[in-house]
Amino acid sequence: YCAFFKNVLRYRKERGVKMSTQKKDQYRETVPHKSHFVPVSVHTTKIEIPTETDGVAALPEKNFPALYLHWHPELEFFYVEEGEVEFFIENHAFLLKEGDGIFVPPKLMHWARTKGTVLFHAAVADPLWLISPHNSECFQKYMYPVCSGSWKYAVTFTSEKNWHKEILTQLKFIFSMDEEKIAAKELLIQGTFLMIWQKLYDHHLKSFYPDAKKRSHPKVAAGSL
């Protein structure tokens, strides 16, 4: 517990000056994000904070670590099923309540804390698996900017907007998959991620992409495919 917040304080202090690549590498997550051969992992975590109603002495109200400070080259979707957390991406804080989610772009430092019991899920995927760089036009348009490691691409999801709700529904489907199911249904999982990505692009990412408005999409004549 103490070591966790010491790392956070050290990180915040180091953010005052430009962090060297060597220092940032200290926080790189070493856990491989794979389900057999598929570069996707799904995680479910429940953190229980005792209260007086549990028949034990309540812990003093303060922040407890929910997600340790780290970063990874993969993109991540995080969802709170029960409770609430304060989620940090770099130096930016987001309050996630029950039923909320957040998109974490690749290469960004992130962590979370909570004041009470919380149940959350995370889906981590290799962006190069979602859209291959060999498909250069598609990759440059939809994925490459996000891989630059900028916090501005982060976005929270709530039940207040329809496109948010659609993404949350698709994320819940992904969270229902264990390692065996992911390996057996790779195309279905990839397709679900891509549907999420299309909505994310249309409603959020597109506004940050400098050449998105310049692109034109010629119509394909029926029967020409």
Tell where the protein language model's regions lie, with residue ranges.
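Generic protein-terminus/edge-of-domain signal
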Residues: 1-97, 101, 140-141, 151
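Short, Lys/Arg-enriched, Trp-marked, Pro/Gly-tolerant hinge/linker segments that flank
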Residues: 153-164, 178-225
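Short beta->alpha connector loops
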Residues: 85, 107-109
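A hydrophobic/aromatic-rich effector-binding and dimerization subdomain
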Residues: 20-52, 109-175, 206
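Short histidine-centered beta-strand/loop micro-motifs
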Residues: 58-59, 65-72, 113-115, 133-135, ...
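Tight coil/turn sites that cap or link beta-strands
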Residues: 64, 98-99, 107, 126-128
